[in-house]
Regions:
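Conserved ABC ATPase "signature" region
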Residues: 125-146, 194-197
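Catalytic Walker B motif of ABC-type/P-loop ATPase nucleotide-binding domains
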Residues: 175-179
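The feature captures the beta-strand-to-loop junction immediately N-terminal to the Walker
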Residues: 46-48
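Conserved ABC ATPase signature
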Residues: 150-154, 158
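ABC ATPase NBD coupling module
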Residues: 77-98, 123-131, 201, 241-245
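Conserved catalytic motifs of ABC-family nucleotide-binding domains
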Residues: 171
Length: 257
């Protein structure tokens, strides 16, 4: 699959975690978590505080080493790979905290990532190719009008869009979003949901963990609910919302989408 900015996603692309386990001392926080993300699929990883969802997410990202189980990306075992090697294989991670260069403007933030990329033959991108991809990304993420704006002047929603543009500059197969709806206003939430839909249309698999349940379920194709270190339930948002056990331990009886 190709796009105007050069993203290439394999037809059989998938990210899969199987039987993940993690303990800290005598406390086991992740007992048995398995999940998968296919190309062009938006998956939510949700659950109560302390359930093990964040630790599971960080194991998939590569920030936390698993004690058991495995992680595969497009059939390749990445369980013990550090985050930078997973990134080279096509896994992009957007942390909750600001990840843009605060002293650069918007276009230089994206250009800095593009200058590290190579073409299909492994050669550095030409200046013309960099500038074309830069223009395409700024347009697609609707930040073209901000290209000369300093990063420090961006709102929370604008910053998120620039961060996603930077992530797309690496031509990822999967993007893992940590709390993408945190600290932004309702209008920006709608814009982030639109962008996630845009990633899906590009064939990129998206894994989201967030405390904002409605916003996350509102964009997901599939969700996994983690409780007490295990997968309590999985399925479509409708299935999750109507699951009696999920309502009892997580959503509450009066939850509505």
């Amino acid at each position: 699959m190709s796009t105007s900015t050069g993203s290439r996603v394999a037809d059989d692309s998938h990210l899969r975690a199987q039987h993940l386990q993690k303990s800290y001392g005598s406390r086991t926080v992740v007992k048995d978590v398995s999940l998968s993300v296919q190309k062009g699929e938006v998956v939510g990883l949700l659950g109560p505080n302390g359930a093990g969802k964040t630790t599971s997410f960080y194991m998939i990202v590569g920030l936390v080493r698993s004690d058991g189980g495995g992680i595969q990306m497009d059939g390749q075992d990445v369980t013990h790979m550090p985050i930078h090697r997973r990134s080279r294989l096509g896994l992009s991670y957007l942390p909750q905290e600001a990840s843009i260069f605060r002293r650069l403007n918007v276009e230089d933030n994206v250009r800095a990532v593009l200058e590290l990329q190579t073409d299909e033959s492994g050669r550095p991108l030409t200046r013309d190719a960099i500038e074309q991809r830069l223009t395409d990304l700024l347009h697609e993420l609707r930040v073209e009008h901000l290209r000369a704006s300093p990063a420090l002047a961006l709102s929370g929603g604008e910053r998120r869009r620039v961060e996603i543009a930077r992530a797309l500059a690496t031509q990822p197969r999967f993007i893992l979003l940590d709390e993408p709806f945190a600290g932004i206003d309702p209008i920006a939430v709608i814009e982030i949901q639109r962008i996630i839909g845009f990633l899906k249309k590009r064939g990129i698999g998206v894994l989201i963990t967030d405390h904002n349940v409605r916003e996350t379920l509102g964009i997901c194709d599939h969700a996994f609910i983690i409780n007490e270190g295990r997968v309590l339930a999985q399925g479509t948002p409708s299935h999750i919302v109507n699951n009696a056990e999920v309502r009892r331990v997580y959503l509450g009886e009066h939850f509505k989408m």
